[in-house]
Amino acid sequence: MQLTLWTYEGPPHIGAMRVATAMSGLHYVLHAPQGDTYADLLFTMIERRDARPPVTYTTFRAQDLGRDTAELFKEAVAAAHARFRPQAMIVGASCTAELIQDDPGGLAKALDLPIPVIPLELPAYQKKENWGASETFYRLVRALAGAPAPRPAREPGRRPLCNILGPTALGFRHRDDLIEIRRLLDTLGIAVNVVAPLGATPADLGRLRDADFNVVLYPETARSAADYLKKAFGQPFTQTIPIGVGGTRRFVEEVAGLAGIDPAPVLDGSGSRLPWYSRSVDSTYLTGKRVFMFGDATHAIGIARVAAKELGFTLVGLGTYGREFAREVRAEAAAHGIEALVTDDYLDVEAAIRAAAPELVLGTQMERHVAKRLGIPCAVISAPVHVQDFPARYAPQMGFEGANVLFDTLVHPLMMGLEEHLLGMFREDPEFHDGVGPSHLGGKSFGTPADEAFEAAERAPADTPPTPAPVPILLERPAATAWSPEAEKELKKIPFFVRGKARTNTETFARERHLPLITLETLYDAKAHYGR
């Protein structure tokens, strides 16, 4: 067992909640104690949904453990059916209730309800949230899609028909991605049969078999179900994720191939501004920027390709917290000449960010906190996220409009507009000088402690009695290295968002060579050394 302040994924029953909450006419009865009942908080506060999630808890207490908790569960199932009248129910246990082994599936079956009741076996101590969402959706599809049968040929003249699989509640920009992809498919002349889980009913899952093929937007949730539909009904499914201009064009070509139609109407009129913007913006702010990427596999891989191939960034880190897709992330990292980071420990991610010294961090809510602590620009590109990443505006990550949103997301944190003449103009300004630090970091100063002490002394009233000097405490740390005036002046010519790294590297270089004074020559030697 590991104690932590942060986890990238919850237990698997949270994934089941995401699927149940996304659908209509489905109810989830969860065998859980007091304390595991926080679904309302997740979906109404963080995602800002206007309805409570369809989840009923047994909420047994400590004193209930001395009597029949199985009877409590049966009562909760019967009461939920009588009150909500769902088309279907799923039943399971939370991570805590799993320990008492009450068999929710068998207990619900014994009630002989007049609706489908699908039991979920979600091993809370081996698997996590995304696996739980995938397993829940797979079980629902397997139970409700009907008996396996070969797919009939499409009638002449009928529009191609597809299902869109993967979007869930609490998903990162799933609502807006769905709008964008439906628009793309409509432009291609492809009709959408069912979208699931988001917005689907159990009856809709019975119509999945009618489609010609499936569009998988989020493999973490939908790949298992898509594999089953391919085996049971002969429905192929897409492998390309439409993130970025290149990814979207490949997606359109793949979908057109599955549907047997011409992709030209969409490819010729894509209208994305990302390609031109990335060519027209001053390359000083784009080409070669060092970027660290971490998130779920779908977004980490897709946006890594956008950053490297469409914006000219240099990828110095790529990782995921989802071990189910570690192979794909490792393959993508190898294509960029780096080693993938596969971990669900945020401290490992923070250590990797420190070691890589990137100029931009793209990650989850936790990487936002880490980057702020380290003074590095950051943008959120993957779940888990907090309330501010469920915006009221339209902000997809997929499709051609998603590529426009990604351009803004990736470029704006890099302090656009700070051309060299502006840096020179404001370098010594008392209000806007570079020692103030970026405004988005809450006024964090990048000045040295000596500078701050000098400024504090200048602000103190003249008649203030001198404060006694504190007794020095000796710490075992490298002695500070002195800088010559010429070297300090040259250092100030470096833009402030990379100056800290240049100072650190130069001082490390000088200490390793026992140089008491950093001169102009030392600065250039250090630059050449680390450049190699």
Swiss-Prot record:
HAMAP family: ChlB_BchB
Organism, as annotated: Methylobacterium radiotolerans (strain ATCC 27329 / DSM 1819 / JCM 2831 / NBRC 15690 / NCIMB 10815 / 0-1)
InterPro entries (UniProt xref): ChlB/BchB/BchZ, LI-POR_suB-like_C, Nase/OxRdtase_comp1, P-CP_red_C, Protochl_reductB, Protochlorophyllide_Rdtase
Subunit structure of this chain's protein: Protochlorophyllide reductase is composed of three subunits; BchL, BchN and BchB. Forms a heterotetramer of two BchB and two BchN subunits.
Entries under Gene3D superfamilies matching the protein: 1.20.89.20, Nitrogenase molybdenum iron protein domain (3.40.50.1980), Proto-chlorophyllide reductase 57 kD subunit B (1.10.8.550)
Binding locations of substrate: 417-418
Entries under PANTHER family matching the protein: LIGHT-INDEPENDENT PROTOCHLOROPHYLLIDE REDUCTASE SUBUNIT B (PTHR33712:SF7)
Family: Belongs to the ChlB/BchB/BchZ family.
UniProt name for this protein: Light-independent protochlorophyllide reductase subunit B
Enzyme Commission numbers on file: 1.3.7.7
Cofactor remark from the record: Binds 1 [4Fe-4S] cluster per heterodimer. The cluster is bound at the heterodimer interface by residues from both subunits.
Pfam families: Oxidored_nitro, PCP_red
GO-annotated biological processes: light-independent bacteriochlorophyll biosynthetic process; photosynthesis, dark reaction
The keyword ATP-binding appears for this protein: yes
SUPFAM superfamilies noted in UniProt: Helical backbone' metal receptor
Reaction(s) the record says it catalyses: chlorophyllide a + oxidized 2[4Fe-4S]-[ferredoxin] + 2 ADP + 2 phosphate = protochlorophyllide a + reduced 2[4Fe-4S]-[ferredoxin] + 2 ATP + 2 H2O
GO-annotated molecular function: 4 iron, 4 sulfur cluster binding; ATP binding; metal ion binding; oxidoreductase activity, acting on iron-sulfur proteins as donors; oxidoreductase activity, acting on the CH-CH group of donors, iron-sulfur protein as acceptor
Active-site residue list: 282 (proton donor)
Binding positions ([4Fe-4S] cluster): 36
